Amino acid sequence: MATNFISYLTAGAAAMLLSACNGILSNIYDEPATDAVSEYGFVSEATTTSPGSIYIDATDYTVWTYIDFRSMTTTALDVNAPAPDSWDIAIHRYDAKTNGAEVMETGATSFYSLANVVTPAGSDYISDIWTETTIVTDMSTMMDGYLSYAGSFYNPELSKWLNVDKSSMPPIYTPSNKVYVIRLSDGTLAGVRLANYMDALGVKGYMTIEYMYPLKL
C-alpha cells in the first residue's frame, strides 16, 4: 500500500516536472503549441479605410507560406517545392520574399498615419536578392556549430519587420512596427505591417500581419 502510494507520488512529480520543462523549452525553441489557434489565412478583409488581417503558422523551418492579396489565399509549401502560379509575397519563419515586387520601409507605425509620412519614390524600393546563407531549414545542428540553408530569393527590406538577435540565448526579438509598401509586379501597391509574431500562448512563429490591398497613396 505504502509502496503504491510512493510510486503514485513519484509519477505525479515526474509528470509535473516534465510539464514545466516542456513549457520552458517550447518558449526557447519555438515549438508550436498543441492548442494554438487553428484559423489561418485571411482572417479579416481590408477595406478602403481599414487594414485587414492575415494569420499564418510560420513555425516550420522547411515551409514557405505564399500570400496572394488578390485572391485572399495563403498556401504553405515545402522550401524546395515550386511556387504556386499566383502569389505576391511569401514568408519563411520571419524571412520574406516577393514575386517580382519591390518593397519600401516607411516611417509609419500604422496605416492611419501612412499617407503623412511616405511618397512612392522609385529609388526607395528594394528588390529581392539571391541568398544561400539566410533561409535556415534545420536548426537541430546549431549546438554543433552549423546550420542547414536553402538557396532562395529574399527581400532584405521586408524582412526588417522583425530583427532576431541570436548573439545570446534565448534570442532577442525586436519588431520594427513599421508599415511596408510593396510595389507588385503589375504596378499596384500593397501595404503590410507585422502586428505580432506570437500566438495567444506566447509561442513564437505565429504571425499576425495587417495588410491593405490595393493600397492608395
Q: Would you name each region that the model predicts?
A:
Residues 18-20:
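C-terminal motif of bacterial Sec signal peptides marking the signal peptidase cleavage site
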Residues 22-217:
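Surface-exposed, beta-sheet-biased, low-hydrophobicity segments with strongly acidic/polar composition
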